[in-house]
Amino acid sequence: MDVVEVAGSWWAQEREDIIMKYEKGHRAGLPEDKGPKPFRSYNNNVDHLGIVHETELPPLTAREAKQIRREISRKSKWVDMLGDWEKYKSSRKLIDRAYKGMPMNIRGPMWSVLLNIEEMKLKNPGRYQIMKEKGKRSSEHIQRIDRDISGTLRKHMFFRDRYGTKQRELLHILLAYEEYNPEVGYCRDLSHIAALFLLYLPEEDAFWALVQLLASERHSLQGFHSPNGGTVQGLQDQQEHVVATSQSKTMGHQDKKDLCGQCSPLGCLIRILIDGISLGLTLRLWDVYLVEGEQALMPITRIAFKVQQKRLTKTSRCGPWARFCNRFVDTWARDEDTVLKHLRASMKKLTRKQGDLPPPAKPEQGSSASRPVPASRGRKTLCKGDRQAPPGPPARFPRPIWSASPPRAPRSSTPCPGGAVREDTYPVGTQGVPSPALAQGGPQGSWRFLQWNSMPRLPTDLDVEGPWFRHYDFRQSCWVRAISQEDQLAPCWQAEHPAERVRSAFAAPSTDSDQGTPFRARDEQQCAPTSGPCLCGLHLESSQFPPGF
């Protein structure tokens, strides 16, 4: 027998021994098992979340009693929403109530509806049992799974007993998912996520909840556990932009100390949400995450950096993100309603600026499906991962067009900076003749002077102060200027000047004052070779226009 066969038989025997311990049940481990001893008297030592305390709990305070009464009163409202789910699943009321708090006895049915568990069970009858049996026979990570299960939610009454019922169910779920999704296989965080589902869902429902959570585009959690997932890079880039915009001093210190590239703070936050804070706050944040989707990750990151601003500016190179994790947990060990209030405010602010979601991922960023274009917050929240199109442009940014669109005849085509093409167009019958309406500044006779084929659509749902504003739908930081009256009157000047003068004006070298502007320096620094025309050079600055603009 060669070495490979010996190793294979040894792994098979080890796998069978681990499974046999879980089949025997409670206290079936070795004598040197260091797990906590069973604590059977749970009368006055268990809180309302199921956490077992070694000492007897004090009587309820007035605030805790008020919170329990409030949760009981909210139960009927959530039951009504579940009874008429088609009406409430896309409503603002669902989001508002999720931030206020989801009753514990409603959390299981609500999670099941949000993740479409029943639909998955109907589409895959008996598949969970098949995956579970295959995982028992061929799992390659069963030792890691067993080791992680021994430290998962051990203070909870469901998982306190080693090799108990809930630990056995957790083992089955993780083995089945390893077989179901070989790309992810098993990661340490999956044991904590599945354990949270097992607190409120049966075994098979918890498995399909885990499947939906990682497979749904709405939550995009697979990128944090898959080696080929493109979610992490997109969220990481967006996080760096959001934090750098709101906490410039903090990120400046991190860049100066070369701390930003040492560890991913976003992945660190995911682990904090799983097993780093109190169970009550963890459950409430997961409620919001399941309702809102991946939009909740950016606000949580922003809140963390905002709270830790003073401490992060004093962080040295010695374990920066380890300190960040510990201090984040200590800081947010406070009232849950306060945390959710700050989270809601941050969500509204980032959504208003379209900073809650990163731009669509490029094909080279991973094998995951292409990410949908982030929609405005004015849309309704969808529960099946579908996203509505962004709202149309409001009346604040009307595009100057003809009232009755006349036919147009192209005069000439001129290449312009950035690979765009400018077509000098006039209404048929008016080539070279100034329009009387244009001379008078009439709106119905105005059209755009420059027809940029690669110009992005203006983000018309932002609160704009001044003519310059960020466009968040593109990865490059492009600055676009709103259409001014001079742009509308441009054809009057164009009718009097040949096209050669227009080309020479755009081909003229930039002056020193142009190169010294912060917009030009910033865009030239961020401009990288990409597929398609580069948008970073499309500045409609005064120095680039011919005289008279």
Curated annotation (Swiss-Prot):
Residue ranges, annotated region (Disordered): 350-426
Compartments, as annotated in UniProt: Cell membrane
Record's keyword annotation contains Lipoprotein: yes
Low complexity composition-biased segments: 398-417
Keywords per UniProt: Cell membrane, GTPase activation, Lipoprotein, Membrane, Palmitate, Ubl conjugation
GO cellular component: plasma membrane
Transmembrane segments: none
A Pfam family recorded for this sequence: RabGAP-TBC
Main location class: membrane
Lipidation (S-palmitoyl cysteine): C318, C325
Origin: domain of life: Eukaryota
Rab-GAP TBC domain residues: 101-293
Miscellaneous comment in the UniProt entry for this protein: TBC1D3 is encoded by a collection of very similar paralogs with multiple copies of each paralog, some human genomes encoding well over 50 copies depending on ethnic origin of the donor.
PANTHER family: RAB GTPASE-ACTIVATING PROTEIN 1-LIKE, RAB-GAP TBC DOMAIN-CONTAINING PROTEIN
Protein's job: Acts as a GTPase activating protein for RAB5. Does not act on RAB4 or RAB11.
The protein, known as: TBC1 domain family member 3B
